Amino acid sequence: MPLLMALGARLPDRHAGLRNNVLHYLEEENGHDDWILNDIEAAGGDRHAAARSTPNVETEAMVAYAWDTIMRRNPISFFGMVFVLEGSSAALALRGADAIQNALGLPDGAFSYLRSHGTLDQEHVKDLANILNSLSDPEDRAALAALRRYLRWTY
């Protein structure tokens, strides 16, 4: 959520039309942290310990780089991150949830986030395609491609 809020605040006036997309995306993503914590608890984990935990170094690097790029370079680059995360989720979430559940014998309730995102993110990918197709500035396209390349490496 903080990355989306930073994106919305940093979008230049020439991209004012994308602000509604960012607001819609914020509404869509709100509460997803709780879904993950619910799944951790359903799998027998400690939701409170998970909420207090710190991210691994790769996750921290990915988020920090995206934040820095939004704040200091070109905020449009954020859509490169969305491309990687939503595209990966749409492609892998449902199969991944099934494989993990079968291997570990966990209940259905431990996979609400992954299973919902396997479906939701397919719609997000379509929305993202519309956004990407609206970007014609070569600097914007280069910025989102650069962040996408970096995030593929860290993700």
Model region roles, listed by residue range:
Residues 1-155:
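Non-heme di-metal
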